[in-house]
Amino acid sequence: MVTLYGGVEGGGTRSKVLLLSEDGQILAEADGLSTNHWLIGTDKCVERINEMVNRAKRKAGVDPLVPLRGLGLSLSGGDQEDAVRMLMEELRDRFPYLSESYLITTDAAGSIATATPDGGVVLISGTGSNCRLINPDGSESGCGGWGHMMGDEGSAYWIAHQAVKIVFDSIDNLEAAPHDIGYVKQAMFNYFQVPDRLGILTHLYRDFDKSRFAGFCRKVAEGAQQGDPLSRCIFRKAGEMLGRHVVAVLPEIDPVLFQGEMGLPILCVGSVWKSWELLKEGFLLALTQGREIQAQNSFSGFTLLKLRHSSALGAASLGAKHIGHLLPMDYSTSAIAFYSYTFS
């Protein structure tokens, strides 16, 4: 009888399941809707997981009544012990044929396990931002990830908000803008389709949509690429804020992570990283300064990586490892390095 291992990438918008053979071959995949239990509740979350795994089983030519050997789930909110325990109980009680064993981890743990064998830093900058350190022993610590009301520094939302605020404060004569506001002001009116600042208030309060507001970041990026000094300045500052998140976790990093040939592996997740060239100056500045204070001797360099495979792959590998089976992983195909730096 065929032995299968499964992995789930549980996102806030979309989810993915991969089924693997014992020798690490991907046999089937299935896509689905959000499986974030904070957004949709535990019941719907486990139903969607069961439905996706069964769909993948059928694609792999396996009877849905034959349980997987192990299922690893990489879920946002997978670090809340009570919620994880409840999810496990629901999966076992309601769907006894789904899998023989389960491991639920954070989305960051699944991501890094897809990219490297020993852990590293996951630095997320999409609509929001977050930084998670996963040490070789599986222990985690982090900085950020508290949402737009408390932070999300360096994210698309933060960049959009900075741009809008600099324009408002400059017109009010509250704070002088570091550069001419002309481009950003006009881009702001065009993007939100309003004639003046009062029109923007609708988008900030009555009709507030975080993703839509964060989307203005794209217009700031376009300005920066065209050479607008204010847009470039905002992105440089965003790079600095993201770098400071890495500096914040330096004291917690197992020295082993500094010693590989790539230096500290930093996995970059989220669409803001598409503008790496605009973030670069501020990012390097923050890490160079932070390193002098925090970890000068051991922190000699780093490599930025991006995933080429779903983090469901890393989740499957962690789920298998949890029951003593090592799935062969080809890290060179599952992640790609796009920037390396050695401190002088």
Curated annotation (Swiss-Prot):
Q: Which reaction does it catalyse?
A: N-acetyl-D-glucosamine + ATP = N-acetyl-D-glucosamine 6-phosphate + ADP + H(+); aldehydo-N-acetyl-D-mannosamine + ATP = aldehydo-N-acetyl-D-mannosamine 6-phosphate + ADP + H(+); N-acetyl-D-muramoyl-L-alanyl-D-isoglutamine + ATP = 6-O-phospho-N-acetyl-D-muramoyl-L-alanyl-D-isoglutamine + ADP + H(+)
Q: Which residues bind ATP?
A: T13, T127, A214, S271, S275
The PTM Phosphoserine maps to: S76
> Could you tell me which pathway this protein works in?
Amino-sugar metabolism; N-acetylneuraminate degradation
Which residues does the record give as N-acetyl-D-glucosamine binding sites? N36, D107, S129, N130, G145, W146, G147, D152
Keyword field contains Cell division = no
The reply on keyword Lipid biosynthesis is no
* EC number(s) from the headed UniProt entry: 2.7.1.59, 2.7.1.-, 2.7.1.60
Superkingdom of the organism of origin: Eukaryota
Q: Which Pfam families match?
A: BcrAD_BadFG (PF01869)
The entry's keywords: ATP-binding, Immunity, Innate immunity, Kinase, Nucleotide-binding, Phosphoprotein, Transferase
- The record's top EC class is transferase
Q: In this chain, where does the modification Phosphotyrosine occur?
A: Y205
Q: Self-association or partners: how does it assemble?
A: Homodimer.
- This chain belongs to the protein called N-acetyl-D-glucosamine kinase
Q: Which gene encodes it?
A: NAGK
